[in-house]
Amino acid sequence: MSLWIFLRHGESEANRSRVFSGHQDVALTALGEEQARAAGQQIADMPPLQHVLSSDLQRARCTAELALQASGCTLRIQTTSALRERNLGEWQGQSIDRLKAEGARAVLHSWSGHAPGGESLAMLADRAVAYLAAQPDHGTTLLAGHGGLIRVLLGLIDGTPWDEIGRVNIPNAIPMTRTVGPETWTDILRSLHPQSAN
């Protein structure tokens, strides 16, 4: 069993402006950079990292870089598009408050619902878990990512009913830990597609 530390990026320009970013590559704010460094100080008090994974989007990657610097860790960051935020299609760059007032909340919370041209939580889960299941067990791992991504991964680890996962709040730049076994991601991937596992 290995300790995994899940870290949502610090405040981004899109967070501050209250717009959906999804796959858009937006930067951290000055506050977001401070949050990332503070997270690194917390991570310094945890077991030493042996592996670091990150979304390739700059808000997650920069959060990982700043957190590692603050923690004194010099590991290389393995970045991948497989750990990106949920693609929100036509909603990317649009006002969160306006879209939620127009009924987007139910779609966002649904396991299978998606924005026009975007991904559902189920599609995000398929993409991310397939990638993680293909990785060797490196021991204590930091995963720097996004609210939607981490919401899905923690929900699946914890056994949260799929249609409740979308309601889980993931704060910016607060390290969240779970114990992950060598078969955890493979078992979760099978659970997402029980018919193909037979």
Sequence positions of predicted segments:
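Generic beta-sheet signal
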Residues: 4, 139-148
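Acidic, low-complexity terminal tails and accessory targeting/binding regions
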Residues: 1-3, 39, 69, 73, ...
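Generic structural signal for well-ordered alpha-helical scaffold segments
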Residues: 37-44, 125, 129-137
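Short secondary-structure boundary segments
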Residues: 56, 111, 147
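Phosphate-handling substructures
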Residues: 69-127, 167, 188
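Short glycine-rich phosphate-binding loop at a beta-alpha junction
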Residues: 49-56, 78, 140-144
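Alpha-helix capping/helix-boundary segments
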Residues: 59, 149-150
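Active-site-proximal alpha-helix that buttresses catalytic centers in soluble enzyme cores
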Residues: 7-71, 102, 119
